């Protein structure tokens, strides 16, 4: 399957595509065996996040993709990975240029800042200070390997 994805990416790159947005890319490695997700009291469904996100081979897979498809075109391709549930520490690993995985990530932690006791369908007023603290935390956590200015550069990615 990975080889087929690399072939598809190469096909698009040969036609002039400059980059890829990779949705839920942190879900491509799973913890096996897959089991039923634990279901909280009153929940309609279980939460499988621990079994499907940031799996044991995720960094291996992303590095392999980078080396086989992207590295042969230095400076010509940009990658951004959508990573629901990723922590800032995980995002720093995914975007560290020395690791050769992704250029940027985007996440949704700040979106949940208005979740009330009933979750996202029970929104509460947004506290501007909390939002600023959240975004500043992400910028500081990713700053060692990236440009926290909001500008995308060829050498470093912007993450938030």
Residue ranges of predicted features:
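Residue-level preference for long, well-ordered alpha-helices that form the structural scaffold
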Residues: 1, 47-58, 123, 127-131
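Aromatic- and acidic-residue-enriched carbohydrate-binding clefts of CAZyme catalytic domains
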Residues: 32-56
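Active-site-proximal, well-structured secondary-structure segments within enzyme catalytic domains
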Residues: 24, 32-36, 99
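Short, acidic/polar
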Residues: 1-13, 135
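Conserved alpha/beta catalytic core and glycan-binding cleft of carbohydrate-active enzymes
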Residues: 62-160
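Active-site-proximal loop/turn and secondary-structure-junction residues that shape catalytic pockets
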Residues: 24-28, 83-85
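Conserved, mostly hydrophobic/aromatic
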Residues: 5, 12, 22-23, 79, ...
């Amino acid at each position: 399957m990975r080889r087929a994805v690399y072939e598809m990416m190469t096909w698009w790159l040969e036609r002039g595509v400059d980059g890829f947005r990779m949705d839920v890319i942190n879900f491509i490695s799973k913890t096996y065996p897959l089991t039923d997700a634990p279901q909280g009291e009153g929940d309609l469904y279980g939460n499988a996040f621990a079994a499907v996100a940031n799996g044991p081979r995720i960094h291996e897979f992303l590095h392999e993709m980078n080396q086989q498809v992207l590295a042969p075109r230095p400076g010509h391709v940009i990658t951004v990975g959508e990573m629901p549930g990723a922590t800032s520490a995980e995002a720093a690993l995914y975007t560290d240029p020395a690791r050769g995985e992704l250029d940027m990530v985007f996440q949704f932690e700040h979106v949940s800042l208005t979740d009330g006791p009933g979750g996202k369908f029970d929104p509460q007023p947004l506290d501007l200070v909390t939002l600023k603290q959240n975004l500043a935390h992400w910028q500081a956590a990713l700053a060692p390997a990236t440009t926290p200015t909001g500008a995308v550069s060829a050498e470093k990615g912007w993450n938030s």
